[in-house]
Amino acid sequence: MAVRLCDVASLLRSGSWAAEPWTGQVIAAMETQLSNGPTCNNTANCPNTINNCSSPVESSNTEDSKTNLIVNYLPQNMTQEELKSLFGSIGEIESCKLVRDKITGQSLGYGFVNYIDPKDAEKAINTLNGLRLQTKTIKVSYARPSSASIRDANLYVSGLPKTMTQKELEQLFSQYGRIITSRILVDQVTGVSRGVGFIRFDKRIEAEEAIKGLNGQKPPGATEPITVKFANNPSQKVNHTILSQLYQSPNRRYPGPLAQQAQRFSRFSPMTIDGMTSLAGINFPGHAGTGWCIFVYNLAPDADESILWQMFGPFGAVTNVKVIRDFNTNKCKGFGFVTMTNYDEAAMAIASLNGYRLGDRVLQVSFKTSKTHKA
């Protein structure tokens, strides 16, 4: 059933594909595969194909899922047209979509390809799954139809050793079920791991088992227990019970000016759930379309914007900060807002700073809930 790799390589050499910066790497990968032979143990089932033998494709029972594929780990600069052309070399495509960030427009590294013929979808999996493009090894599998059993299967993991690789992260979690995607967040400047990652399982029950088995445990190379929890989705109603249990660590204390300012804060004034909900309707300029808006509560009266920049800046790109002040006294009213461009970075900041002790105050940090700000 597999399409010959030499045919795909020849197709890539022709037309506009020849000029693409990563086309040569694709062809080289295919020719290496052809010269070295199949890499999987069962050579009879995968002649001249690139396959991820450690993650066998699982077929679904519905006809739609037999033609609809999900493609993970795509190069950041790959366009939707290039994705369509690559998979169109296998067979006729009904639709193709590269998933992009709703705010920045940047590729999220995965997409969907829907074929006319189920046989072409199967050929695409056998031919292109495991293909290396630039620094990425793409993963091609059947897209799963939506159901309650697969929703909310995305986990947020913090406290990871900075030396842990994405492969090691998957090895740690793979014992609990089939992993769909994984990611470790790195500093955009240094490229060093931030010790935070995401794991998406095939089913929610697998994610639940991973939480039971790994939350609070020390993986190899770790000096402190890791925290494993369901990733917070800003499109859902905020679960304040879960937020109150988010990751805290004595190592997450900020030195320098932030520590000096923290010494000035002396009063702790806890906030009720109803209080947080009632403030969610405040109109913070730019929150609807410029990024993910974060609500920060329990700031001291003399808190200013600089402390929010210093707190949230290490987690990613911050586009705006605002401390809400009393009109008469010009003192902080106890809360403020931070806007970050990237959801993963915003989620990491929330997980790290919710419950963070700033002087004698314990901060409450969550996504700002608003009818006008939807995921």
Swiss-Prot record:
What's one Pfam family here?
RRM_1
GO CC field: cell cortex; ribonucleoprotein complex
Record carries keyword Ribonucleoprotein: yes
Main location as per UniProt: cytoplasm
Q: Gene3D superfamilies from the xrefs?
A: 3.30.70.330
InterPro entries reported in the protein's UniProt record: ELAD_HU_SF, HuB_RRM2, HuB_RRM3, Hud_Sxl_RNA, Nucleotide-bd_a/b_plait_sf, RBD_domain_sf, RRM_dom
Keywords per UniProt: Cytoplasm, Developmental protein, Repeat, Ribonucleoprotein, RNA-binding
Can the keyword Cytoplasm be found in this entry's annotation? yes
Give compartment(s). Cytoplasm; Cytoplasm, Cell cortex
| Positions of the RRM domain | 67-145, 153-233, 292-370
MF-aspect GO terms: RNA binding
Q: Which family does it belong to?
A: Belongs to the RRM elav family.
> NCBIfam families recorded for this chain?
ELAV_HUD_SF
Tell me how this protein assembles. Answer: Part of a ribonucleoprotein (RNP) complex, at least composed of elavl1/elrA and/or elavl2/elrB, igf2bp3/vg1RBP, ddx6/Xp54, ybx2/frgy2, lsm14b/rap55b and, in a subset of RNP complexes, stau1/staufen. Binds RNA as a homooligomer.
Q: What does this protein do?
A: Binds to poly-U elements and AU-rich elements (AREs) in the 3'-UTR of target mRNAs. Required for the vegetal localization of vg1 mRNA. Probably required for nervous system development.
Q: Which PANTHER family match?
A: EUKARYOTIC TRANSLATION INITIATION FACTOR 3 SUBUNIT G (PTHR10352)
Q: What name goes with this protein?
A: ELAV-like protein 2
Q: Which organism is it from?
A: Xenopus tropicalis (Western clawed frog)
